[in-house]
Amino acid sequence: MLLLPLPLLLFLLCSRAEAGEIIGGTECKPHSRPYMAYLEIVTSNGPSKFCGGFLIRRNFVLTAAHCAGRSITVTLGAHNITEEEDTWQKLEVIKQFRHPKYNTSTLHHDIMLLKLKEKASLTLAVGTLPFPSQFNFVPPGRMCRVAGWGRTGVLKPGSDTLQEVKLRLMDPQACSHFRDFDHNLQLCVGNPRKTKSAFKGDSGGPLLCAGVAQGIVSYGRSDAKPPAVFTRISHYRPWINQILQAN
């Protein structure tokens, strides 16, 4: 079974996002998710890719470590990423803080902070999203949401408009087929009996549970069948705090 990071996978997004689109989701009401960030990434070998992310401070975006690149431009306040609006704020990333223990083989510690060159202006279309404390443990069974511009199907292109999908947090056993899944570091998301998921292009987007970002779209199966694996944000709160305080 082939496993791919979300920028290479297509997941069902109306509740979570990757670097593609949401599968089994619906289009969000324009600008109803003001924390969402669209990342245009220039890679070291030339080709561009894109990911999702979310604004946690006026000058910091949280995303997945596998979304790192030679340079990154962040677009805030977007709904249709092909039609520029007055709500858009395009900001350059001046520093990428990829977690020092990020492992490209296991995709453990798939989390990264992006420092923006300028602070975002908070508007009706651009806002920050709260994230959990270190010991905030969200239980299996909870319904959450993920959003993104990723693929809406395995063989479909990315979505122009922001999509969202509702996904259920699963027991860790549901992700036992992922050899490197670690319940302490990650969340298992998406009912395997449903056809909803996040996929390629949704990577880096937030898993929103009761208004709090609990997870980050990380990886899943190459056929986009749920469940998928999300980075557990609460585990990394001390590291996040350290970066924010030092910068």
UniProtKB/Swiss-Prot annotation:
Q: Name one GO cellular component term.
A: cytoplasmic ribonucleoprotein granule
Q: Which SUPFAM superfamilies does this chain map to?
A: Trypsin-like serine proteases (SSF50494)
Instruction: Provide any one GO MF term from the record.
Output: serine-type peptidase activity
Q: Which residues form the signal peptide?
A: 1-19
- Glycan attachment points: N80, N103
What is the E.C. number?
A: 3.4.21.39
Residues in domain Peptidase S1? 22-245
**Where is the protein found, in the record's own terms?**
Secreted; Cytoplasmic granule
The residues annotated as the active site are H66, D110, S203
Propeptide residues according to the Swiss-Prot or TrEMBL record: 20-21
| Family from the record | Belongs to the peptidase S1 family. Granzyme subfamily.
Biological function: Major secreted protease of mast cells with suspected roles in vasoactive peptide generation, extracellular matrix degradation, and regulation of gland secretion.
The entry's protein name is Chymase
Name the lineage. Eukaryota, Metazoa, Chordata, Craniata, Vertebrata
